[in-house]
Amino acid sequence: MTEDWGGDILARLKLRDDLESRDSKYFEAFDLLRRKKVIKGTSGDPDVAAENERLIEKLNNLAIEVEKKDSQISKLKRQLSVAEKTIKSHQNKLENLALEVQEKNKNIEIVNDEVLMNQIQTAVLQKKLGELTKENETLVKRWMDRVSSEAQQMNDANQFLESMRKTSG
């Protein structure tokens, strides 16, 4: 049962009352015919009485058949209503999923753009790193050459001083 079981019971009782009140005219007509038959008694033509009995039986059967068909129609209408609600729910779910897919596709595009931008930045930075590494090697070589030259000059000066000391001394 659903959460609103009281409402379900009331709805079913109302449906039953509606069905009974709708068919009450048939029951009243049958009752009237029955009373007329009792009043007339057994007088009259037996063939007519038999025909009336047969017609009353046929009318009763048709009334029962109409009631069954009405019940089936009501049941089918309820099933149709449930099916329509289910379809609507699934359509809403499908629309929500489509929107979610669109949003995710946009997010994927953004991420792809960011990845591409990062790859470009990485390439630029690697190029800059290569240039700076080359420049650093050049500067280190120049510095080493200069230090080596200064060391050689100091060695030459020391040798000169040494040789001057030896000759003067």
UniProtKB/Swiss-Prot annotation:
Coiled-coil stretches noted in the UniProt entry, renumbered to this chain: 47-164
GO-annotated biological processes: autophagy; protein transport
Subcellular location: Preautophagosomal structure membrane
Record membrane topology: Peripheral membrane protein
Cited Pfam families: ATG16 (PF08614)
InterPro entries per the UniProt record, alphabetical: Autophagy-rel_prot_16_dom
GO CC list: phagophore assembly site membrane
Main location: membrane
Keyword list, A-Z: Autophagy, Coiled coil, Membrane, Protein transport, Transport
Similarity remark: Belongs to the ATG16 family.
Function field: Stabilizes the ATG5-ATG12 conjugate which is necessary for autophagy. The ATG5-ATG12/ATG16 complex is required for efficient promotion of ATG8-conjugation to phosphatidylethanolamine and ATG8 localization to the pre-autophagosomal structure (PAS). Also recruits ATG3 to the PAS. Involved in endoplasmic reticulum-specific autophagic process and is essential for the survival of cells subjected to severe ER stress.
Subunit structure: Homodimer. Part of the ATG5-ATG12/ATG16 complex. Several units of each may be present in this complex.
Protein name in the entry: Autophagy-related protein 16
Organism: Meyerozyma guilliermondii (strain ATCC 6260 / CBS 566 / DSM 6381 / JCM 1539 / NBRC 10279 / NRRL Y-324)
